[in-house]
């Protein structure tokens, strides 16, 4: 059950925040007494994030935090995340949902094929007049004509 996991974390993480755990469980309407195997994929992801944010770590790694959740839950999560972090807490968020996170991240580190291809503070991007998406496209050498060329090849209209 969720409460059994909470008890395990409380025992092994001295800085575990029961208050944060309970508040987030209530916010996401997750049952404390149901077996985790009965949770939907979205609920399991929410629960994993709740546990990560409640353990009291200075650095919290969250990988594709809300895969399987609708846009409303994801937006709510981002707002809650921005509001609950203490000054000593840093979240490292891995995501492909760039537009959703661009408004509240302070730094973007781009990793491609195991190597860092970009590392920039979002303030620098804003000052340059670019968006995070345009910065990423530039760093990844994205070809803007990629789709039209593929469609020409598929439909045979380029011949």
Map each language-model feature to its residues.
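ABC-family P-loop ATPase nucleotide-binding domains
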Residues: 1-47
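Walker B catalytic motif
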Residues: 64-65
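Helix N-cap at the start of a conserved alpha-helix in ABC-type nucleotide-binding domains
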Residues: 71-73
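H-loop/switch region of ABC-family ATPase nucleotide-binding domains
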Residues: 95-96
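A short, surface-exposed alpha-helical micro-motif characterized by mixed small hydrophobic
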Residues: 101-103
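ABC ATPase nucleotide-binding domains
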Residues: 122-159
């Amino acid at each position: 059950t969720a409460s059994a996991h909470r008890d395990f974390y409380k025992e092994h993480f001295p800085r575990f925040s029961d208050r944060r755990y309970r508040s987030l469980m209530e916010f996401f309407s997750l049952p404390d007494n149901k077996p985790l195997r009965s949770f939907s994929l979205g609920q399991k992801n929410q629960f994993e994030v709740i546990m990560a944010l409640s353990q009291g770590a200075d650095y919290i790694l969250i990988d594709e935090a809300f895969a399987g959740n609708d846009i409303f839950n994801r937006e709510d999560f981002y707002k809650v995340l921005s509001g609950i972090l203490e000054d000593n807490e840093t979240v490292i968020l891995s995501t492909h949902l760039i537009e959703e996170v661009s408004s509240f991240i302070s730094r973007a580190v781009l990793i491609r094929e195991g190597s860092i291809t970009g590392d920039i503070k979002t303030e620098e991007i804003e000052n340059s007049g670019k968006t995070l998406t345009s910065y990423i496209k530039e760093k990844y050498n994205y070809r803007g004509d990629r789709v039209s060329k593929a469609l020409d090849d598929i439909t045979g209209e380029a011949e």
